[in-house]
Amino acid sequence: MSSKGGSSRLGSKDLKKMTSRTERELRDSGRVRGEVERVEKRLRATAKVKEQPPTGDYKRRALASPGETAAPTFLVDSRGIPRKTSSTAPRKATLRPASSSPRLASSSRPTESTLPSSSSRALQGASSSSSSRPRRLHESASGRGGSGGSAGELRQEKKRLPELEAAEAAPASCVVELRDVTARKGRTSPATPPETAGSSVCGQGSHARTAEKLEEGTASHRDGSRRGSVDAETWATPGDGSSSHEFESSPQREERMQPQETGRRELSSEPRSGDLTKNGGDGGPRRHSCAWRKWREHMIQSFDITTHPFPPRGDGSPRRGKFLMIFLTSSVLFFVFLQELVLNVTTFNGRCMSPVLYPSHDAPESERTPRVISFGYGACEHNLGVSLFRREETKKDPRGRWTPGPLTERCASGRCASDDGWPSDLVQRGRAQRSPAAFDSPNPRVFSSLGALDTNKVRNYGEMFRVVWGMFLHGGWMHLLLNVSCQAQTLWILEPAWGFLRTLSLWIVGGVSGSLLSAVANPCTVTVGSSGAFYGLLGALVPFSIEYWDHIASPAWFLFCVSVLVMVAQFGNMVGVQGVDNNAHLGGLIGGLLFGFATIRSVHAFRWQGVAERMASSTLFWWMFPAEKRRSLREDNLQRVAREREERSSGRIPPPKFVWKFRGHEREWCVRFAAAVGLVTFWSVLWLYLLVPSYYESLSSPPGNFSFLGSTGCHCCRVQPFPGEEDKLPAFHPVRVNRGLFWCFVSEGVANLFCGRSSALNRGADVYGQTRQFEEALGDLPSARAGEAPLRIAKEEGESASVWQRLVKSAKKTYNAVLGNTTTPAAPSAAELAQQTRAGQ
């Protein structure tokens, strides 16, 4: 560019740049002009719909002319509370939403004639005094030339377009996230109250609430969700210009009005108590209703109460972070089972974990002294007669007579984890302790070492931890996966509604209840597994369905399916499945059922009238009710709902109680109290029969594990030698070593031998005084100690009973046990014992 004689000449490049810039500005100005015209058109349409005469004590005079208004000016502070009103003379005014003020709405909006035409391409101010008015959104572009203004002004207009779009939208406080708690779908949808004559877009009574807030001044609001609703429901129209106020921006206001609670919210569209008082009504009931709502929100915020069991569908996973109990229990159970496998390998199937080497019993006397092997598995290899790695074959040592055994491999689980006990050439009768393993489980011998539920060790050695720790162990991969999958499916329903602490307490109570009943009713076997806790979750589904009766789509069907599932699971295991502890299942079911009712939040929704109506309308029970009865039930239920709604609306409800979540109903407290007493009684009786000798000794013949084929039988007694054989038994005989213990045996013959009811010495006894009968009886001990409980009836020798005879015998035994007619064989007298001994000799 060059300058000469006061004139300037543009170069070709500069001229191109200016031309392209001018074309771009013209194109942008046309686009902006079109957007402004569309926004102004929508504003005029909205103002025409909203222009209705106000009602109430604060009626405004009709507009004298299309461009005049006599509405008072409502000025609000930064918190959204009205501070001052000015009633000025009518003056010419047009709609001018302020850029820095929140989006406001009022019933006295200007008419279509008060708005500028679309050709003006600008929104004019509402007052001639620019010093006292808020900043304009758009400058008039009529005097800017054909281009529609400079480039800076065009950019400003483009920036203000979103504000114009927001100005014609509904106020933010009118669209409240309202969770429909009566609908069973549990969805969340933005809800707006209906428009009525004399009310704004946000609901009825906006002018009355506005006037009340003007009188209150800086008084605090009754409801947090109602804060800022007046400034969102009233469009600010400047007055005489005596005072101006800088409003907070809409994003700041929306952030301030963000609700803190995650539960339900209600629209604050009902009139306040002051409105009723001014109109001649009684504001007391409204105060109670408002106090109730405030108390409910306080409880939700303070205690994080879940008011709806089914979270709404939204962005992302609505249940994210809701299943801590599922992941916690599953991970713990898997970790403990892996520890079982590790211990099964390192202890040689539970047979050896000590570094002490015990020489053979036929070794020279000078070499029979046990010794400690400080490193390696040499001690266990010698004691078990195996070798873990290939060694050079050597001849037998003439002094120690020890040669490395055959090469063997250790397994964590499966058939290879089975063993034949201890070698007979090293351990007397070592082969009698044979222990087989299932295809998916470690050797059952390790369960007792890991802390499985063993009633005999709990009573005699005080190992109380077995009552709790036994439910973390599992017998195999199939057992573990089945329990974890069933628990996850049940916790998927319970945990989002009941929360982590309540669900964790339920899981522990169910597991301990199952362990207690199993330990008392079947003390002969070793029990592992968390199926008792799972049945506790199943039992809790019954109070869950009653507690959330109004939120479940088909609660009657849900309750029916839960009942059928429990019966099928319980009775299915009683058909003849071996290795299943039905006592633990039954105890967990009772514990979970009682705990669920003891902690139930409300039984308010479970009324017979509503239940009968649901049953009459269901496809399962409709045939039980005639058509007239079904119609009558439905009408009665609708009348009851309408009556309760009228009572709540009129204020005939009691003030909020302290314990809000329990609703304070006497019937509900009776249910909780009865269930809590039942649970405490159930636990107390079981603990007494588990730990107190005077109680469990009176139960000498517990029922054992039961099924439709009968029961396994269980026989308990004090271990003692047969009278007259105390000095004849060897020093390390099992009877002499364990003398005085109260032990329970599966076989009645074994119990008679160890409890002194039958003689262990007989013709043909070996060096230890053990007869063939005694050795055969000992064959039942490995299965009893290893936790294998074959489902059979304990019968006398030579007795062959059919299935029908077993059922009859089991029924008679149960009948006698219930009536207290169980006969225990009396201990023989000294004369009878002497006579039996002489006859045997």
Swiss-Prot record:
<dbReference type="InterPro" id="IPR022764">
    <property type="entry name" value="Peptidase_S54_rhomboid_dom"/>
</dbReference>
<feature type="compositionally biased region" description="Low complexity">
    <location>
        <begin position="1"/>
        <end position="10"/>
    </location>
</feature>
<keyword id="KW-0378">Hydrolase</keyword>
<feature type="compositionally biased region" description="Low complexity">
    <location>
        <begin position="95"/>
        <end position="132"/>
    </location>
</feature>
<feature type="transmembrane region" description="Helical">
    <location>
        <begin position="526"/>
        <end position="546"/>
    </location>
</feature>
<feature type="transmembrane region" description="Helical">
    <location>
        <begin position="571"/>
        <end position="590"/>
    </location>
</feature>
<keyword id="KW-0812">Transmembrane</keyword>
<feature type="transmembrane region" description="Helical">
    <location>
        <begin position="323"/>
        <end position="343"/>
    </location>
</feature>
<keyword id="KW-0645">Protease</keyword>
<dbReference type="InterPro" id="IPR002610">
    <property type="entry name" value="Peptidase_S54_rhomboid-like"/>
</dbReference>
<feature type="compositionally biased region" description="Basic and acidic residues">
    <location>
        <begin position="11"/>
        <end position="51"/>
    </location>
</feature>
<keyword id="KW-0472">Membrane</keyword>
<dbReference type="GO" id="GO:0004252">
    <property type="term" value="F:serine-type endopeptidase activity"/>
</dbReference>
<feature type="compositionally biased region" description="Basic and acidic residues">
    <location>
        <begin position="154"/>
        <end position="163"/>
    </location>
</feature>
<protein>
    <recommendedName>
        <fullName>Rhomboid-like protease 5</fullName>
        <ecNumber>3.4.21.105</ecNumber>
    </recommendedName>
</protein>
<feature type="active site" description="Nucleophile">
    <location>
        <position position="531"/>
    </location>
</feature>
<feature type="region of interest" description="Disordered">
    <location>
        <begin position="1"/>
        <end position="289"/>
    </location>
</feature>
<dbReference type="GO" id="GO:0006508">
    <property type="term" value="P:proteolysis"/>
</dbReference>
<feature type="compositionally biased region" description="Basic and acidic residues">
    <location>
        <begin position="243"/>
        <end position="275"/>
    </location>
</feature>
<feature type="compositionally biased region" description="Basic and acidic residues">
    <location>
        <begin position="209"/>
        <end position="230"/>
    </location>
</feature>
<comment type="similarity">
    <text>Belongs to the peptidase S54 family.</text>
</comment>
<feature type="transmembrane region" description="Helical">
    <location>
        <begin position="673"/>
        <end position="693"/>
    </location>
</feature>
<feature type="transmembrane region" description="Helical">
    <location>
        <begin position="464"/>
        <end position="484"/>
    </location>
</feature>
<dbReference type="GO" id="GO:0016020">
    <property type="term" value="C:membrane"/>
</dbReference>
<keyword id="KW-1133">Transmembrane helix</keyword>
<dbReference type="InterPro" id="IPR017092">
    <property type="entry name" value="Pept_S54_Rhomboid-like_Rom4/5"/>
</dbReference>
<feature type="active site">
    <location>
        <position position="585"/>
    </location>
</feature>
<feature type="transmembrane region" description="Helical">
    <location>
        <begin position="492"/>
        <end position="512"/>
    </location>
</feature>
<dbReference type="Pfam" id="PF01694">
    <property type="entry name" value="Rhomboid"/>
</dbReference>
<keyword id="KW-0720">Serine protease</keyword>
<comment type="function">
    <text>Serine protease involved in intramembrane proteolysis. Cleaves microneme adhesins, such as MIC2. This step is essential for efficient invasion of host cells. Catalyzes intramembrane proteolysis of AMA1.</text>
</comment>
<dbReference type="InterPro" id="IPR035952">
    <property type="entry name" value="Rhomboid-like_sf"/>
</dbReference>
